[in-house]
């Protein structure tokens, strides 16, 4: 999609003082080509760019806008909070209220600590696992993203199961950090057991996205999450489920409630603040009591538990806890994905969709199942790029990467679904 001169000029201006013109790399459109669209405002299921063009949005600020953009109840809560003061650097009753809500909804969380982001939450959960166990090694999985802390920007090294060393995926990450992180194939129980057989007594914890959102959207195979629970129990390692993306998104109780698995620690992201900058980690009392000021594992943040995010989150949960909220959300997404699949089939284009609650993945492939990072890499990335730009041109905003999941909100109407399916029909016809 070619952008207006105004958009091109804005990107040029942004690139003058912002590295790459963006404040988060995926926004640069490197995964799909072209120049990013500059957004002016959002409301409900829609975004409007600086030229006034409207888009049906399936990114939702990367997941947290589950009620849609600028929901009036959330806006009112934030405005009321702002009138009382933006930040105090002191406790408020709203932190306690939100903590109570989270612990009630997720029984695996007995104590919870607020942070400023999902990255902070996962970074501290790793530190906490190490502090609790007195061990150094961490296990993670291909295709799972846990933020940009040094310990987690690591891929599998050639000597993983001989030397137990991973390799940094970013410059600036010391090899001494990476060597303590073991990266395994997602959904591979045999590799998990082999890793623990060799390094189990050195492993502080295992961290995983229960539904992997950094290889589009891949669900765990039957028994995979329980296998992690079992080896962590056997070797007394900490099981960390990263629900920054899935928490309160795939179900009210998160993915852990869907797959009936109980972690030792859980990390959460900005959805708990209705999209404002916030995160959290929580879990077993005996582990969480290792965090300062109760224990020797340090974590702090001036804006942790900031009143705007707390009060927005409290208001949001009133909607999420309605009895039929998630069933309606899931049904609406099923309707969308069925329509997209039918449109692709009619055009004769190999295409597959996957769904977990209100989270989805789109793949250009004739594979029956997408269960790993390797199967994701076997998909047609070039076809996705064409599809992305065709949909964007027709007023549908998808994640600008074949490796990112999509999201639907309660604001998406039947008309929005039909509009999207029609845009897909036209785009698929163009791709034939």
Swiss-Prot record:
This is Glutamate-1-semialdehyde 2,1-aminomutase. Pfam families: Aminotran_3. NCBIfam families: hemL, PRK00062.1. Belongs to the class-III pyridoxal-phosphate-dependent aminotransferase family. HemL subfamily. The keyword Aminoacyl-tRNA synthetase does not apply. Its EC number is 5.4.3.8. GO terms for molecular function: glutamate-1-semialdehyde 2,1-aminomutase activity; pyridoxal phosphate binding; transaminase activity. One of its GO terms (cellular component) is cytoplasm. Homodimer. It is found in: Cytoplasm. Its cofactor is pyridoxal 5'-phosphate. It catalyses: (S)-4-amino-5-oxopentanoate = 5-aminolevulinate. GO terms for biological process: protoporphyrinogen IX biosynthetic process. It is an enzyme of class 5 (isomerase). Pathway: Porphyrin-containing compound metabolism; protoporphyrin-IX biosynthesis; 5-aminolevulinate from L-glutamyl-tRNA(Glu): step 2/2. PROSITE patterns: AA_TRANSFER_CLASS_3. The modification N6-(pyridoxal phosphate)lysine is found at residue 270. Its main location: cytoplasm. Keywords: Cytoplasm, Isomerase, Porphyrin biosynthesis, Pyridoxal phosphate.
